[in-house]
């Protein structure tokens, strides 16, 4: 499992399932689960600008400096038809995004292997989520 630090508001948009691609200047061959870490610094793009450009209302305060969720990279392409795609970048195509309980954690640059303690915790939460859905009970994390 990997971990990727992303600035807010983008991290929350991903784990809420709204943003379906993550734009990067570099490609990846990795396919699989990724823990989403919200960086200590928020992006310069304001909540108002996100609402104007993309029609999505954001909370006034978002968690910083910790784990906020998990997603899955299923492809890496350039270009991509998503409204979230930034021209000239590589689009990490994301599926099965969902929030996790916030956990303070130091982030890393690039796409890195997640420490064992994070991987096992996320896999456990991930497995319970899938099991609950199969039984017809949607479980929110």
Give each language-model segment a name:
Residues 1-141:
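Structured alpha/beta reader/binder surfaces that contact nucleic acids or chromatin modification marks
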């Amino acid at each position: 499992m990997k971990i990727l630090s992303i600035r807010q508001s983008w991290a929350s948009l991903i784990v809420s399932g709204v943003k379906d691609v993550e734009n990067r200047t570099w490609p990846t061959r990795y396919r699989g689960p990724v823990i989403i870490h919200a960086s200590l610094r928020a992006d310069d793009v304001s909540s108002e600008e996100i609402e104007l450009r993309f029609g999505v209302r954001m909370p006034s305060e978002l968690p910083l400096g910790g784990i906020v969720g998990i997603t899955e990279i299923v492809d890496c392409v350039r270009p991509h038809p998503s409204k979230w795609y930034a021209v000239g970048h590589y689009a990490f195509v994301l599926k099965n995004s969902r929030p996790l309980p916030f956990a303070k954690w130091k982030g890393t640059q690039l796409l890195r292997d997640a420490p064992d303690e994070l991987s096992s915790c996320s896999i456990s939460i991930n497995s319970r989520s899938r099991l609950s859905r199969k039984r017809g009970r949607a479980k929110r994390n």
